[in-house]
Amino acid sequence: MTAFHSPRLFLSLSLLGLLAGCGGDPKPAPPAPVVVGPAPTAAAKPLRIGIALGGGAAKGFAHIGVIKMLQANGLEPVVVSGTSAGSVVGALYASGMDAFQMQQAAVALDETSIRDMRLFSGGLVQGQALQDYVNAQLKNRPIEKLGKPFAAVSTRLEDGERTVFVRGNAGQAVRASSSIPGVFEPVTIGKFHFVDGGVVSPVPVDAARQLGADFVVAVDISSKASGKNPAGMLGIVNQSIAIMGQRLGQQELARADIVIRPKVNDIGAADSAQRNAAILEGEKAALAAMPQIKAKLAQLQQQRAAAAKAAQPAAPPCEPRSRLGRLIGRDDPCKKQE
């Protein structure tokens, strides 16, 4: 007679005997249990880089150099806002042009073709030629049909309110954003009149945030008071606007993640002959800021990843093995999670 020296073996054989003695048709096996594990970790969404391009008349060619260096380093802005000259470059960039195409367009630009000089009650330049030029470059697409989200910032003349154009006629929005008071005729849109956005938002950081940018690179090309008389009427008006918007501008710039300041103070507001020099200064300034940009982006990405991980639901509590499970030697799932 064989003795059962192992209670575990005895119990297993007893269970087999009971199952074998059961008559009737075999019942279908129940479905396999579903194992619920911890939810997969959600990857942090890629950061949306925005660029806010400030006003500065002919100094605005520097924006092209900044964009060129960002693209060369794989940091493509996907959101664009612009004030005055920044709105011109911003619209071209948002339309799908890269920095090299914009530079070609800048070099080929005949300045007289966008200056419809006539004596109007509100300014020396009507601005229709600028509007037509921008729309031609954009193939007459409205703002909402451009390749990237774009905002042109202007000032409503009736009450001084900042106005952000994100839909409609792109050329008209750029014209409104660029209508330097006393030089350009105010632009009539609906029942309101609009002038240069630099009066209320010299570098439109907030507009870039409103478009969904997580990380904003601001480009400040505004004139700084040098103690000297600015040259020409346009220089005087441009510096006057910069002084008026200086305090507001500093507050808004503080909300940017990075501020790039190309050294373009020596370039006159109307000195379009130095467009290549301005582009080069933009490249230099962006290249100098690149280590800081990359470090801040990496830091923000780490913060986002940590926040996404912390937001994941905790794993469901394990169920300890039953008495029968212990008898037949089933592994304890709770010990595996320890």
Q: For the regions a protein language model found, what residue spans apply to each?
A:
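Patatin-like phospholipase
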Residues: 2-9, 13, 22-80, 92-338
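Gly/Ala-rich beta-loop-alpha elbow adjacent to hydrolase catalytic centers
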Residues: 82, 86
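Long, contiguous secondary-structure blocks with strong helical propensity
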Residues: 87-91
